[in-house]
Each structure stands twice: as C-alpha cells, then as structure tokens.
C-alpha cells in the first residue's frame, strides 16, 4: 500500500508545501512566520538557525555555501568539506570532487544532532541536492532510517541536474528505498515575474503527492544582501496572494510530521 492509500488520501491531490533555507537570514525566518505555513527545513550551520520556531521543521543538510555572504562552515573538522578559507565548498562540483563519504556522514550526523537541540525534527533534505552523489545518497538514506526522519526522495531525477555518471546508481537507490517518493516542484529557476503564474497553474495538476519547495523571504535590506533576493521575495509575494491561497486550498495539505507518524 502506498503512502496516500495508507493515509486514506488515494486519488486526491496532496501537497507538502516546503519552505527551504530557514535559518539563513532573518528575512527567511520572518517570511516563515508571516506566511503561517508549517513545513520547512533549517540550515543548522546558518547564523539564525536558533530563531526558527515551528511545528513541522526538518534539517536542511548543508554541504555547500554558494553565496559571497553569508558563508557557512562545517560543524565538524572534515578537511574534505572545506575550501581554502575553511568554508563549505562554493559549488556542487567542488564538493563532489573532494568530499569523503565518511567525513560527510560525520558532518550530517552533527547537523542532525544539533538540530534536535533546537527543535523536534521531522524530516531531512539537502541544500542544492548535495547528497546526489550516489555514495552520499546512501549515507543520507541510512541516516534518515537511523534517526527515524523522513528523507525527501523525488519520484524522478529528471531536471535535477544530476551528472549522467551518477544516474544508474541513484536510480537503483530510488527503486529500492522504502521511503515515499514525491513529485518534486521547484520554481526557483523561473524569472521572478513568472512566479505568480507558476503558483496559479498548480490548479491544473492531476491527483498525486506533490512536494513544492519555495524560498520565501521578507523584503528587507538584510534579505537583499543575497544575490538571489528577487526570487525569494517573488515566492513570498506569490504565496501571500489571495488567488494563490485559493488554489492551494484545493489540495489536501500534508506535513512531514504526519508522514513520519505514518511510517514510524
């Protein structure tokens, strides 16, 4: 029996609406509180991780730090996870070229354990999909099982930028995992002016389990220190729009906490 059948939601349109990058800035945290949508994940190495309070929070596992500021450092001493200045690598390519799986495992454990001191985590996901190198994906799924947290597992790898050499092993892991798989939706790459239309078009989706990630941030000087601030503000304004709220109300809302209770 699949997850939706187990939850009595078979044949329904079900949506996990997920707020990424919490803990990164006050603007990100403020948008989470202002929108009143419960599900999101926290970047534990972020400066403002301790300021996030909510009912359905996960760990947004960090292995890269791509912005000029703020930069983030590992919680552990793994040399393969640091650049010359001691920060996480700036790109997935740099991470995947250098990272040792045993050091990644220690770092992810440290982030999960630190998160548990701040809130009661329900789920795991990874910033920039950093665990899509197959050996790191195995670590990610193993830690999810060990800590009884639900991992984000996409139904398809299409459009996620996975290097072709990684695909066969990742597809095997997807096939074998006991965790539920979701239809992954992420408007991050769309121009900000197209964001509202993207959310309104959700009205046309067929039944299924959807995971929609957004990066909403308040319009503040601090939030605008990030180079991608227009896309973050576009998410915030779109999700505040009454017509978008009407479209979202047509879905059955689901939290990772409810999924976790069903699985564990």
Swiss-Prot record:
GO terms for biological process: carbohydrate metabolic process. Pfam families: YdjC. Keywords: Carbohydrate metabolism, Hydrolase, Magnesium, Metal-binding, Plasmid. Gene3D superfamilies: Glycoside hydrolase/deacetylase. Homodimer. Mg(2+) binds at residues 21, 60, 127. Its cofactor is Mg(2+). InterPro entries: Glyco_hydro/deAcase_b/a-brl (IPR011330), YdjC-like (IPR006879). Its EC number is 3.5.1.-. Transmembrane segments: none annotated. This is Carbohydrate deacetylase. Belongs to the YdjC deacetylase family. Probably catalyzes the deacetylation of acetylated carbohydrates an important step in the degradation of oligosaccharides. The active site is at residues 20, 215. GO terms for molecular function: hydrolase activity; magnesium ion binding.
């Amino acid at each position: 029996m699949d997850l939706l059948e187990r939850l009595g939601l078979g044949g329904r349109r079900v949506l996990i609406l997920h707020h990424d990058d919490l803990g990164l800035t006050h603007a990100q945290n403020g948008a989470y509180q202002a929108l009143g949508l419960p599900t999101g994940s926290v970047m534990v190495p972020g400066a403002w991780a301790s300021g996030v309070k909510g009912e359905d929070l996960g760990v947004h596992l960090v292995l890269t730090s791509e912005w000029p500021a703020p930069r983030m450092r590992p919680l552990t001493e793994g040399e393969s996870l640091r650049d010359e200045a001691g920060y996480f690598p700036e790109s997935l390519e740099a991470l995947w070229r250098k990272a040792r799986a045993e050091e990644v495992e220690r770092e992810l454990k440290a982030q999960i354990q630190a998160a548990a001191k701040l809130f009661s985590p329900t789920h795991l996901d990874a910033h920039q999909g950093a665990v899509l190198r197959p050996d790191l994906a195995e670590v990610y799924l193993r830690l999810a099982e060990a800590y009884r947290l639900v991992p984000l597992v996409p139904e398809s790898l299409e459009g996620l930028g996975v290097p072709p050499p990684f695909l066969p092993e990742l597809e095997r892991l997807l096939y074998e995992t006991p965790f539920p798989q979701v239809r992954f939706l992420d408007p991050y790459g769309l121009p900000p002016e197209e964001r509202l239309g993207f959310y309104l078009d959700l009205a046309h989706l067929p039944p299924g389990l959807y995971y929609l990630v957004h990066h909403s941030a308040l319009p503040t000087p601090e939030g605008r220190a990030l180079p991608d601030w227009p896309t973050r503000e576009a998410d915030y304004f779109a999700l505040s729009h009454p017509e978008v709220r009407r479209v979202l109300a047509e879905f059955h809302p689901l939290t990772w906490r409810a999924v976790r209770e069903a699985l564990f």
